[in-house]
Amino acid sequence: MQQFTIRTRLLMLVGAMFIGFITIELMGFSALQRGVASLNTVYLDRVVPLRDLKTIADLYAVKIVDSSHKARSGRMTYAQAEQEVKDAGRQIDMLWHAYQKTKKIDEEQRSVDALAKLVDEAQDPIERLKGILERGDKAALDTFVENEMYPLIDPLSEGLSHLTQIQVEESKRAYDAAVVLYDSSRTMLALLLLGILICGGVFATRLIRSIIHPLTTLKDAAARVALGDLSQSIQVSGRNEVTDVQQSVQAMQANLRNTLQDIQGSAAQLAAAAEELQTATESTAQGIHRQNDEMQMAATAVTEMSAAVDEVADNANRTSNASHEAMDLADGGRKQVMLTRETIDRLSGKLNETTRTVFRLAEEASNIGRVLDVIRAIAEQTKLLALNAAIEAAHAGEAGRGFAVVADEVRNLAQRTQTSTQEIERMISAIQSVTQEGVRDVQQSCEFAARSQTMSSEADQALTLIAERITEINGMNLVIASAAEEQAQVAREVDRNLVAISDISEQSTAGVQQTSEASEELARLAANLNNLVNRFSM
């Protein structure tokens, strides 16, 4: 992994996490779309047909039968009863044709074919009933109601009841399929998310180690340099931002070692010159000329030392420039981390859109619930109508017994409709619960995106620490440059002293003592330089 730059490694981590979360989002969208399609099928092919079948059953059992009985008992005129029967016939035709256009299973289609024959066979008796009501023939109406009405209506009611039961069973099957779809989608998403988290965790751990280990090595090397240990070389491996800094510090260490070696050599030369100068001062006056020659040699050595010090200053300046370049690279890494955080923010926006989609699904489920409320209200009204019909049949005595049977069947049908509506309500509640769990899953994905953003912030902090360490190295370069400047000043001062000693030696013999003192000062300076260099282990 050291062969890749930190930027490349971070992009690989974020890219892998981004692809994983996009995959989860697409799978979630797919599951939601299939769930919406299932709900749409339940509503259009089951709930609406259930409503229409219930209405058709009510039209046969309430409108036609009830109007006939009311016309017999005189509570409704024959013209009103005829109009009620005609209206019921038109509504039955309209609803029946609409129902036949819906999607059906094989069992349902067979029941529809059988019921269609009964509906067609009922047309002629109903037309005769219309004619009886139009003529106002009470005897014919009594005969029709007692002999033909219930043999006509009862098979129709049974067929409609059977179709209603099929709608309920198919709604239950659709619900079971939706539950299976939800369970499989949830398991798949959970496994995929777990795999992404495990892979991301392993990759992130390796990434952190690949950054921390070379930084720790670099820190230890810098600490050794600060303690004066220049004997151990810095190991450089890989091609990334950290290795660039390692190479810069390695070059700085080598330059510092060479500089100290030059200083050590110059100090040795200076010590030798001082000893020679001391020997010359102990000689007789005849040795003054020879002493001047030695002074010239000492001046030459100081000049060489000054040149070496200038070279040290130049090396320190080049090291400072390398540190600035490393700082620029660290700033570039921080900018890449900022781009990574922006990418994660866009991912969070996509997850928020997914949440809004799930909420719309919940709203659609609530709309279905309102439709069920309407169906339940119709069932309650039907039960009340059946109860009223039973009461009226009881008032009619023996003549209303058949009508009482029909009213009881209508009430039972309304009760079954109400029970089916409650079952569908439970299904809708389960779907809403599943939708809420989907919202929580998407919110967890948002939290994982936020954690990825936190990891990017930590990488930014790591780059900031690198920049701080580079600043410290730059400060060390400034210290080295300052020391070199001080050494140059000392060399120039020594040169001036040598010139003064030479002048004094030429003027008088008394200057021999002063020259001796100057030579002793030079010896001390050489010893100090040696002590300073000996602090470093090379």
Curated annotation (Swiss-Prot):
Disruption phenotype: Mutant grows on naphthalene but is not chemotactic to this aromatic hydrocarbon. Mutant has a wild-type chemotactic response to succinate, benzoate, salicylate and 4-hydroxybenzoate. GO terms for molecular function: transmembrane signaling receptor activity. Residues 1-9, 209-538 are cytoplasmic. It is a multi-pass membrane protein. The chain crosses the membrane at residues 10-30, 188-208. Residues 209-261 form the HAMP domain. Keywords: Cell inner membrane, Cell membrane, Chemotaxis, Membrane, Methylation, Plasmid, Transducer, Transmembrane, Transmembrane helix. The keyword Cell inner membrane applies. SMART domains: HAMP, MA. GO terms for cellular component: plasma membrane. The keyword Lipid metabolism does not apply. Residues 31-187 are periplasmic. Pfam families: 4HB_MCP_1, HAMP, MCPsignal. It is found in: Cell inner membrane. Residues 266-502 form the Methyl-accepting transducer domain. InterPro entries: Chemotax_Me-accpt_rcpt, HAMP_dom, HlyB_4HB_MCP, MCPsignal_dom, T_SNARE_dom. One of its GO terms (biological process) is signal transduction. Chemotactic-signal transducers respond to changes in the concentration of attractants and repellents in the environment, transduce a signal from the outside to the inside of the cell, and facilitate sensory adaptation through the variation of the level of methylation. Chemoreceptor for naphthalene or a related compound. May facilitate biodegradation. Belongs to the methyl-accepting chemotaxis (MCP) protein family. This is Methyl-accepting chemotaxis protein NahY. It comes from Pseudomonas putida. The lineage of its organism: Bacteria, Pseudomonadati, Pseudomonadota, Gammaproteobacteria, Pseudomonadales.
